[in-house]
């Protein structure tokens, strides 16, 4: 059996934070950019907005068409797929947002069908050889090779202490996978 590669959607394969912030900025006159988000607590960056104002923008079905790929994610995921790696997108997306978000993900990643999308808020329960994620909490205690996808909000996390390999971009991810799990 070929290696199973699990990959996250938000801020790993698609630029979720940029899309989300653009909509919040448009609706509420804020000027925040994704590079400024250095923590998982998004609310601290919007002291004048309610949680409802920040999160309800994701309930608009039209927002998902603004979701774009992270640079080189399409290229390298397609290469891995063509080389025979088994690819599964693993997302903690709320169920109500899944139909529209998954439709957009399938438009962006042609190899991704319904059988290769897993919804799980506890990614440690999903089996695979590799997990690529920007959330350290999704990698800690997982029984897979851990690739922490570098983002501003996880840069202070001590990935070396948790046996995680930090990838600065998709070329790093590709190299790490080939170094650890080459397909012959």
Question: Locations of the language-model features?
Answer:
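Short, basic/glycine-rich phosphate-binding loops at helix/coil junctions
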Residues: 45-60, 84-87
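Structural recognition of alpha->loop->beta junctions
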Residues: 104-120, 161-178
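Substrate-recognition element of Asp-dependent hydrolases with the DxDx(T/V) motif
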Residues: 64-68, 73-105
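A short acidic, often aromatic-flanked loop/helix-cap motif at beta-alpha or helix-coil junctions
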Residues: 122-128, 154-156, 170-176
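Acidic, Mg2+-coordinating phosphoryl-transfer loop and its flanking beta/alpha structural elements
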Residues: 132-169
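A structural signal for isolated positions on well-ordered beta-strands in alpha/beta enzyme cores
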Residues: 86-88, 130, 147
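Substrate-recognition "cap/lid" segment bordering the active-site pocket of phosphatases
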Residues: 90-141
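Active-site neighborhood of HAD-like aspartate-dependent phosphohydrolases
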Residues: 1-53
